[in-house]
Regions:
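Conserved structural motif at the start of ABC-family nucleotide-binding domains
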Residues: 8, 22-25, 80
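Conserved ABC transporter NBD signature motif
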Residues: 61-72, 78-79
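Conserved ABC ATPase "signature" region
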Residues: 103, 107-110, 115-133
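Catalytic Walker B motif of ABC-type/P-loop ATPase nucleotide-binding domains
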Residues: 162-166, 171
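Conserved ABC ATPase signature
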Residues: 95, 137-144
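A short, proline-enriched helix->beta-strand linker immediately N-terminal to the Walker B motif
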Residues: 156-160
Length: 289
């Protein structure tokens, strides 16, 4: 049994697909609140979430979810009853209404009492802002609304652990804001783990962040601590300089640089994105030295 404050415990977990190492000795503990898995494509985020959600078994290491061991069939079933899962690739039957689709998933989740099940379907659809569209056909909904329908099914039964894989992918700014508000409300009482490659998602809702890069856990801690890793390494200047290790346009006609400061550059406070980019840069060890 893990510590009562720990919802998910991952110890030396490894996973390989043919000749590609997806996870290499990953260790981390996740507690209540919102934990963001941040990393580039191919970092191992989806693989790790599938292992925690019990849809994929690790090749090495051990996992505990809510105190249960998913390696044992009986405990794996307990985990699945206690979690909600929004995979990266999702779909919903377009000829179903939003209500009927979520109700169908509730039946699959063995919520057998009809009145309790239908009350819960209404609750989760209202929670994601679809109270006025719950009887609309899914094919008539916008992409953002469809994503919210699938989020609603993950929230059925008030799960103790909610796993969201790239939940804001493809959403417009308004839908992304609404999604973040919903996640924050859920996380006030339960544990949410979400994967993303967008630092703004982490900055907006996450209490902790885990940076995965090429199958390795590069950082675990509060977002402010990740930003602080770039302290003293972030500069802004009016023009780009080839001596800068990384640079990008800030949108105000100025370039932001990580690494060697060009002439006339101004040292500025680091952001979460600065810390993340510095940590995952191919030559990050040289930059931080």
């Amino acid at each position: 049994m893990t510590n009562a404050a720990t919802t998910v415990s991952v110890n030396a977990v490894g996973k390989r697909f043919r000749n590609r190492v997806a996870l290499d000795g990953v260790d981390l503990d996740i507690g209540r609140g919102v934990t963001g898995l941040l990393g580039p494509n191919g970092a191992g985020k989806t693989t790790l979430l599938k292992i925690v959600a019990t849809t994929l078994a690790p090749d090495a290491g051990a996992v505990r979810v809510l105190g249960w061991d998913p390696a044992h069939k009986g405990e794996r079933r307990q985990i699945r009853r206690a979690l909600g899962y929004l995979p990266q690739e999702t779909g919903a039957y377009s000829d179903f209404t939003a209500f009927d689709f979520v109700d169908y998933v509730a039946i699959l989740k063995e919520i057998t009492d009809r009145q309790r099940r239908r009350d819960d379907v209404r609750r989760v659809l209202t929670a994601v802002g679809l109270e006025n569209r719950m009887h609309s056909k899914i094919r008539s909904l916008s992409g953002g609304m469809r994503r919210r329908v699938v989020l609603a099914q993950a929230m059925l039964g008030s799960p103790r652990l909610l796993i969201l894989d790239e939940p804001t992918a493809g959403l417009d700014p308004v839908e992304r804001l609404r999604f973040r508000e919903t996640v924050s409300a859920v996380a006030s009482t339960e544990t949410v783990v979400l994967s993303t490659h967008l630092t703004e998602d982490v900055a907006a809702v996450c209490t902790d962040v885990v940076v995965l890069d090429r199958g390795h856990n590069r950082f675990t801690g509060p977002p402010d601590d990740l930003a602080a890793m770039a302290d003293g390494h972030v500069w802004e200047t009016e023009m780009s300089d080839p001596t800068a290790t990384l640079s990008w346009l800030t949108g105000q006609g100025r370039y932001r640089n990580l690494g060697t400061p060009p002439d006339g550059a101004e040292l500025v406070p680091p952001s979460l994105e600065d810390g993340y980019m510095l940590l995952t840069a191919p030559d990050s060890r040289e930059v931080r030295s």
